Amino acid sequence: MALTADVKDEIARVSVVRAEDMNAEVAALLRYSGALHLVAGQIVVESEVDSSATARRLMEFVEQLYHHEAQLQIIGAGNLRKSARYIVKWIKGGTEIARRTGLIDRAGRPVQGLPRTIIGGPKSACVAAWRGAFLARGTLTEPGRSCALEVATPSNEAALALVGAGRRIGVTAKTRETRGVHRVVVKDAESISALLTLMGAQATRLVWEERRMRREVRATANRLANFDDANLRRSARAAVAAAARADRALEILGEDVPTHLAEAGQLRVKHRQASLEELGQLASPPMTKDAVAGRIRRLLSMADKRAEELDIPDTHAAVTEDLFQDVE
């Protein structure tokens, strides 16, 4: 989890000037790492995090915003804990903090998601909310077969709220439930890179991207080295040819191409040597290989008809021998 620790260390040092953004980060940190307790008729707010920098940042922000001091308890690493945990607790002022961060509504009832003022507020507040959520329960996996940035959430409502915040800043995220735990997952590499940059983890993003590219190069090299089987070579050539034709089809049709066909074509172009089954898994939502093949076939047919009408080169013209040099 070295990358996760690096991200948290980096974004815990990001400077926040606007009180609105500071409040959004605190609200998310408390929502995804916190709990409310009723003690002697008073609400006590508690947050448990895995980083001393995060704990200090949370305490400082709350004191700046609401002028309430916190108590800090450190639980050292032990047999069942690989690292120390930091428990930040507000006994005095807990009710005000819970209300102003949206943990409870005006009637004092617990709220499951994030305040509308954050989701519907400025984009900088949505970025701050993601930063707080990642500091609370985020992980970034090493680039591999399935790279991902994840945030564990206390409820489905909290997960959906984070997905909504991601949508506001151009990040594609999905909810997933595993063994009763709701998670928000970002799997697209471009979205992961964009989110890391937005949150303020540029240095870690560069390291992550370098590792990802290195692994992709190795994977491609290994894949080509194992292309001894003639059927695999033919499949690879067909995939490359289809990608070239799809690229030409999108060029011919321009904005007139139906969205679902355009998405299939773009997948084929972006992943030139992937199998139809792999393309189906990369689609959102996932599709069968037959569905992908059908959409690409309709895209090419539509483009070839348009090319004939316009008397211009069709999609077959894009397939030249130099395309296959990398798969020979």
From Swiss-Prot:
Gene3D superfamilies: Homing endonucleases. One of its GO terms (molecular function) is DNA binding. InterPro entries: Homing_endonucl, Sporu_reg_WhiA_N_dom, Sporulation_regulator_WhiA, Sporulation_regulator_WhiA_C, WhiA_LAGLIDADG_dom. Keywords: Cell cycle, Cell division, DNA-binding. Residues 275-308 bind DNA. Coiled coil: none annotated. One of its GO terms (biological process) is regulation of sporulation. Pfam families: HTH_WhiA (PF02650), LAGLIDADG_WhiA (PF14527), WhiA_N (PF10298). Disulfide bonds: none annotated. Involved in cell division and chromosome segregation. Belongs to the WhiA family. This is Probable cell division protein WhiA.
